[in-house]
Amino acid sequence: MASSSSNRSFLHRNANTFLTYPHCPENPEIISQKLWDLVARWNPLYIVCAREAHRDGNMHLHALLQTDKPVRTTDARIFDIEGFHPNIQSAKSVNKVRDYILKEPLAVFERGTFIPRKSCFQGNTPPFPKKNPNKDEIMAHIISHATSKQEYLCLVRKEFPYDWATKLQYFEYSANKLFPDIQEEFISPHPPSSPDLLCNESIKDWLQPNIYQPADEGSRKQSLYIVGPTRTGKSTWARSLGLHNYWQNNVDWSSYNEDAIYNIVDDIPFKYCPCWKQLVGCQKEFVVNPKYGKKKKVQMKSKPTIILANSDEDWMKEMTPGQLEYFEANCMIYVMSPGEKWYSPPQLPPTEEV
């Protein structure tokens, strides 16, 4: 998994730490012993570390580390070992994380006793610093000492039962900000297989600078527009390129992943695509309004969008001259030829002569 964006300050505070070391062939036991020593001051209680194989044959490691006291650090390199840098996340559900780590291991190492957290965690939360704290001081204490989303909401419910009952959505919002959900490792929904995926030479020229290379400082990527018949494999091809945000039917910003390399807008009519200029223009740091959510700033770096449309929903036919001018200036336009496919036909077995 990709690490957090460098544009955001790093803060990790949790008694349950989930680590992923991509492209790491190290022995799980060696990694576990070094991690155990790294968190000695927080009193480690349990660790499980497993080595798995990517579909491309490369190895990666997952580890769940549980400590008596929450690990508190602003050092994004604290868990670096032998030159390997992990993705660091707070384990929202230690039971699910442990099951995820142990699903298909090639090698496993465990130390200590696993601590399942099925209900509100009581733990060793320190007492309030003063005898009669006010509401703000209690809330600050909860924010400072909660180690998970579940514990945070449990403490709020205990200290402010009326506010919890009437303003739960606001507490859930702050809990999600303090303890983001775990981003599972991306696995392409369309891995290389038979029949092989393919694309036009002109699109190959677009791929290199816009998907496979980082943008130069101050520059912007270029988007790609593909229009053509249905059932030609264009969606399968577009989704095979790497980690992406995928939207079909509507654009839902609530699940937007900043670590994605590119966006895909698939079969959404032009009039129903909000922020189309920002997406097509690969703009940075624009504000969106997710449904049932608060406005937020997204796309901290220039990111291309692949727009896929069938011939009957051709965006260019719906645009004003001014919109079309912007579209053509910021997007490579590819109109499919009759009979064109995005995959090679499967090879038929040779027929025997009679």
Swiss-Prot record:
Domain of life: Viruses
Primary location recorded for the protein, binned into one broad class: host cell
Localization per Swiss-Prot or TrEMBL: Host nucleus
Motif (Nuclear localization signal): 291-302
Name of a matching Pfam family: Gemini_AL1_M
Cofactor(s) annotated in UniProt: Mg(2+); Mn(2+)
Keyword DNA-binding: yes
Extent of motif RCR-1: 18-21
Note on how the cofactor is bound: Divalent metal cations, possibly Mg(2+) or Mn(2+).
Domain CRESS-DNA virus Rep endonuclease, first and last residues per copy: 11-114
InterPro entries: CRESS_DNA_REP, Gemini_AL1_MSV, Gemini_AL1_REP, Gemini_AL1_REP_central, P-loop_NTPase
GO CC, any one term: host cell nucleus
Short motif (RCR-2): ranges: 60-62
Keywords: ATP-binding, Covalent protein-DNA linkage, DNA replication, DNA-binding, Endonuclease, Helicase, Host nucleus, Hydrolase, Metal-binding, Multifunctional enzyme, Nuclease, Nucleotide-binding, Nucleotidyltransferase, Repressor, Transferase
Keyword Zinc-finger: no
Binding site for a divalent metal cation: 52, 60, 62, 104
Motif (RCR-3): 100-103
Similarity field: Belongs to the geminiviridae Rep protein family.
Quaternary organization: Homooligomer. Rep binds to repeated DNA motifs (iterons). Forms the O-complex, which is a Rep-DNA complex involved in the initiation of RCR. Part of the C- and V-complexes which are RepA-Rep-DNA complexes involved in the c-sense and v-sense transcription.
Protein name: Replication-associated protein
Species of origin: Maize streak virus genotype E (isolate Pat)
